[in-house]
């Protein structure tokens, strides 16, 4: 979704970014959203111009974002504040995972399938339970979300460890601020209201940066904030021209849509497409 769509949001969470100063042109859409009555929350270790503009600045200990977002997920699940119809219709939450799967709470911090020799996971136990051929869905689903091996229930068990108390101890965030953030997201993630999540390098430049982004994506999917006006996740990059260069793009090695340039060894369209598939 384009940055302009932020103007349609009812709540905007900016985490790990001083958007007001690093993306001054794009920030105009945050200003427009606030004029409409949107709530702006800035989560960042520093107090910056973005913090001054926000309705609330929540200081966080650097590198602990995954704990904060994990606790918000747990809060939404525990209090039935997720967008049920959206989750059932548009996510893999109802799908059933193999009985062989074990989570980190079962294996002392590791998922099933870990190979200590290679340091990688063999993901056979992570697969969906398949339905017989000819069924309307090719995998088993439980739209009540109550099956113990559904993705939804696995998610609930995994994030149960993240509590407001853990957030306070790990992130240095007062419980009052945590509840303000969680309630703001919940109240503005309904059939007629949306929340937008924006991040930049303060969020990603960590050894766990990819996990931070995954957690934000899980949060936005649980609340129905993907594919609707004023929703989504905005990856702001470090400063304005980098985002534009990759989106348009003006970089020498990529085509619009983040497609790689053809190479000399790809002499036909099928070879080019197959090369993209193999690289991804």
Regions found by a protein language model. Name each.
Residues 15, 29, 33-36, 71, ...:
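Generic, well-ordered alpha-helical scaffold segments in large soluble proteins
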Residues 28-30, 56-60, 73-76, 211-216, ...:
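Short secondary-structure boundary/capping segments
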Residues 89-94, 184-185, 200-202, 232-243:
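A glycine-rich phosphate-binding loop feature that marks nucleotide/adenosyl-phosphate handling sites
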Residues 1-25, 29-30, 36-38, 42, ...:
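Extended redox/cofactor-interaction regions of prokaryotic respiratory oxidoreductases
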Residues 5-6, 23, 33, 43, ...:
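Active-site-proximal structural scaffolding
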Residues 20-23, 48-51, 66, 94-95, ...:
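Flexible loop/turn segments at secondary-structure boundaries
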Residues 166-173, 199-207, 236-240:
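Conserved short loop/turn motifs at secondary-structure junctions
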Residues 48-191:
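Long, well-ordered, tryptophan-enriched scaffold segments
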């Amino acid at each position: 979704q384009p940055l302009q769509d932020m103007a349609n949001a009812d709540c905007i969470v900016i985490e790990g970014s001083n958007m007001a100063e690093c993306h001054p042109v794009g920030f105009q859409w945050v200003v427009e959203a606030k004029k409409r009555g949107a709530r702006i929350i800035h989560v960042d270790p520093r107090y910056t111009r973005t913090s001054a503009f926000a309705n609330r600045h929540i200081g966080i200990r650097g590198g602990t974002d995954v704990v904060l977002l994990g606790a918000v997920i747990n809060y939404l699940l525990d209090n039935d504040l997720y967008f049920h119809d959206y989750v059932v219709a548009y996510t893999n939450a109802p799908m059933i995972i193999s009985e062989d799967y074990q989570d980190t709470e079962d294996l002392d911090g590791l998922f099933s399938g870990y190979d200590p020799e290679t340091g990688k996971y063999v993901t056979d136990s992570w697969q969906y339970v398949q339905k017989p051929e000819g069924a309307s869905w090719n995998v088993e689903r439980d739209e009540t979300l109550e099956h113990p091996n559904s993705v939804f229930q696995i998610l609930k068990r995994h994030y149960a460890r993240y509590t407001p108390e853990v957030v306070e101890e790990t992130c240095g965030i007062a419980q009052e601020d945590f509840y303000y953030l969680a309630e703001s997201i919940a109240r503005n993630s309904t059939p007629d209201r949306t929340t937008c999540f924006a991040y930049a390098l303060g969020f990603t430049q960590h050894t766990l940066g990819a996990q931070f982004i995954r957690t934000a994506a899980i949060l936005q999917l649980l609340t129905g904030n993907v594919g609707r006006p004023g929703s989504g996740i905005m990856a702001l990059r470090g400063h304005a021209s980098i985002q534009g260069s990759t989106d348009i793009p003006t970089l020498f090695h990529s085509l619009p849509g983040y497609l790689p340039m053809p190479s000399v060894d790809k002499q036909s369209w099928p070879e080019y497409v197959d090369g993209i598939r193999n690289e991804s």
